[in-house]
Structure formats: C-alpha cells, structure tokens
Amino acid sequence: MKEYQVYLERARSRQQDFLYPLLFREYIYGLAYSHNLNRSIFLENVGYDNKYSLLIVKRLITRMYQQNHLIISANDSTKNPFWGYNKNLDSQIISEGFAIVVEIPFLRQLSSSLEEAEILQSYQNWRSIHSIFPFLEDKLTYLNYVSDIRIPYPIHLEILVQILRYWVKDAPFFHLLRLFLYNFSNWNSFLTTKKSISTFSKRNPRLFLFLHNFYVCEYEYIFVFLRTKSSHLRLKSFSVFFERIFFDAKREHLVKVFSKDFSYTLTFFKDPNIHYVRYQGKCILASKNVPFLMNKWKHYFIHLWQCFFDVWPQPRMININPLSEHSFQLLGYFLNVRLNRSVVRSQMLQNTFLIEIGIKKLDIIVPILPLIRSLAKAKFXBILGEPISKPVWADSSDFDIIDRFLRICRNLSHYYNGSSKKKSLYRIKYILRLSCIKTLACKHKSTVRAFLKRSGSEELLQEFFTEEXXILSLIFPXBSSTLQRNRIWYLDILFSNDLVHDE
C-alpha cells in the first residue's frame, strides 16, 4: 500500500491548470481554424450565416465575458444571451475552442511520458499498420482463447465531466463547459441515443472525438493500472499512461466488488499471457490460459463499466471462443489460428513409428463480404457484387478515370497482400476493373462490348492485374508466381483505405 500512497501523492502534487482564460483568446480559435482547414465549419462554403470571421469570434467572446452566471436551467436556455442569432455556428466555434484548450495538459503529459520511455526514437520504425501483423504472427499462435467485447456506448456527459475533473484542476473551465453542453442540448438525455451522438459528432467533431477517446482512455487506464500494479511483470511500454488522483478510492471499491466472488481478490490479474487490443469500438482479449481466467477478465470489465461509468454492457453478448474456431476482425482482416497437421514417419532399428505433429499458423483472410458492402456503398457495385458504372466520374477524361480506379485497386492490393488466400482480392480487382469499363462506356454513351472493340482499351485495363506482379519482380529477384502466393507486408502504409472499414 505504501507504493500506492507514493503514487497518489505524486499525482496530487500537480500544479493548478489555468485553462479558463485561454477560452477568451482569439488565437485559440485561429489554431482551431488552421487544424481544420480542409473540413472546418470556418470555411465560407455553407452560406452567409455560417461564414467565419474574427468579428464573429470577438462578438462571441464578448458575450462569454458578459455572462453573469454559469449554471442555468433548461427552461432559460433559449433566452440566454450566451448565444447569438446563429446558435449552431456559435456552438461549433466554442466546441473547437474547448477541444484545443482541453488537449493542452494531456499533450504536455504525453510528451513528457514519451520522452521518459524513449519511445519517440523508435516510433519511426513502427508507424506502418502492417508492422502489427508480423507481431501477431509471433504471438497469436501461442494463444488459445479470444473474446470480443463491445465497448458500452453511449455514456452521459456529466460522468465524463466528473472524470475529467480528476485530471484537470480548473473549476471555472468546467462550469463553462457544463454551460456550453447544457445550452447545446437537453442535459438529462444528452448522448443517450445514437441519434444525438450522430448530431453532436457532425457539428462538433473534434470535441466529440476528444470526449469519446477520453472515456476509452479512462477505463483502459484503470485496467492497465491494476494489471501492472498487481502483476510481477512490470511492462515498460505501459508507462505512457498518465497518473491520476483519487485512484485508491476506486481501487478499494473494486476490491469490495470482487471480494464476494473471489477469495484472493487480485490474483486473477496475474495473467502474463493476456493480450489486449482495442479496435473500432471493440476490445479484444486473447489469452493462453483456460476459459475460467478469461471469464474473470470479462466480469472485471462488466463491473468496471457498471461501477464507474454507469453504463450497462451486455454480458450475454460477450463470448469466450477458442481461437482455432473463431475469427475476429482487426484492421480490415479476419484473423484466426489454423492447426496444420502433418504425419512424420520415424524408424528406429526394426521399429517404425508414425508421429502426428500439429503446427499452429495464423490465418489472415480478406473479408470479402464487408469489402463488397463497401464497394456497394461507394457505388462501384451492387450489394451482390455486380459491377456498376460510376456516372459521377463520367465528366473526367479517360486517363483520369482509369487512374482513379487504378489507385484504388493499387491501395487495396498493397493493403491485402499479406493475406493467406488471395482469391477474394482478385474478385475485388475484377469488380473494380468492370466498373471502370462500364464508367468509360457510360461516358462515351456506348455498350461495354462496343466500347472495348472500338477503343482497344482492354490492353490498358490489364494493368489492374499485371502492375502488381511487375513491381514485385523488380523489388524481389524471385519467381513472380511464388511472390504472389507469399505474404508481403508493406512498412510504408500509415493509414488504410476507406473501403477497408465497413462500419
């Protein structure tokens, strides 16, 4: 317990954060404008009422200065002088300012933590998304069970504000934040439906992402804290997580919750083979141990969300499956562990033995159905995978149309070149190729057969299948047919194609 007390005192020794005055500085909103130059609400493309200018910011800051009280009732929100004649624009500008200001203390802590852990020096070597898969090939083959847990969502914003106060010490800032959220929508029902989440995320994308990521980071912090403090295996990579105050009270409460079910409260945390991954609203747990220990981890997450975030996960939807029989989705792939059995004949003197050997191999599969749904959503095909034309691109030149399709095909080919079976990838290429031909035929107001016969574009469109093999043959001096069957991970992919994600 002495170690926890020292940890708590060090967290309490942080200085006061003075974020409130920054909300009244014009350059903060200028930073928000520069950060969101390509998609910001500040751009003059929505109409006169939504045009951004420093004059609008100055008037908004003046109204914020003149506000006498910060906590008001919902009935008076429509009469409050805090908002101008354009409430939506004011709320968007203020939310951008809130997002910029509230990120400042976290960026400061993150930079200091990364410098202490010396992660920045080696970060350049691990930027690629594909660098994850060689790691999984080494680790997942030794694991036996996996569990997909949907992160409970949405959550009431009052809980997020209370948790945020543990990290940032600035009472006026949080009063103004509550005022902004109260004026924007009904506080009691805010973020309790998917419709309200969609509306808020579209109007205030930066603030929404911060609040959502903060919620996820908070429960992961508690998870990692208990994982490292109660285990003899202290992992240095976990040092990037921040310190927080009032954690002993939460830890004691968690101990009381588990004391009813477990005789040794924290012994189940000592699982050196547990692996945790968060991806697209899910947290994936994989372990080598028996399902009983995985079940304890599942109940830990359920109690954590219920006790500290007042959200109710669905325990019946959390299944623990053998990794050899269950596939889970990660970074646009379907992953599972396949057991390859081989029989070896061994002979000693006059005796002959047949030995059966099982070798685990990570199977990385291209998710063909989600990709077809993504192609249908992007209007390259229908829901059954039948290619259709793209009339929106018909105004471009033939070269630009072919180049667009080739770039999409090339990106998908690079991203999925590490898959175990490439037949699904060839089908996606085929859909894009026919969609390109139909788009060109639609532009020239002709049929596909007549267009190919007249223009001779069939040879040009062969690049969909020949370009990748030609590039690989230049890089690797080996047989091209062998290269096409092998997995190739590219270490220069920093983000995935939009078609990869179907959610």
UniProtKB/Swiss-Prot annotation:
Coiled-coil boundaries: none
Pfam families: Intron_maturas2, MatK_N
GO terms of biological process kind: mRNA processing; RNA splicing; tRNA processing
This protein's UniProt keywords: Chloroplast, mRNA processing, Plastid, RNA-binding, tRNA processing
GO cellular component term of the entry, any: chloroplast
GO molecular function, one term: RNA binding
Top-level taxon of origin: Eukaryota
Keyword Phosphoprotein: no
Key word RNA-binding present: yes
Compartments, record wording: Plastid, Chloroplast
Functional description taken from the UniProt entry: Usually encoded in the trnK tRNA gene intron. Probably assists in splicing its own and other chloroplast group II introns.
Protein family (similarity comment): Belongs to the intron maturase 2 family. MatK subfamily.
HAMAP family cross-referenced by the UniProt entry: MatK
Protein name, per record: Maturase K
Protein's organism: Lathyrus vestitus
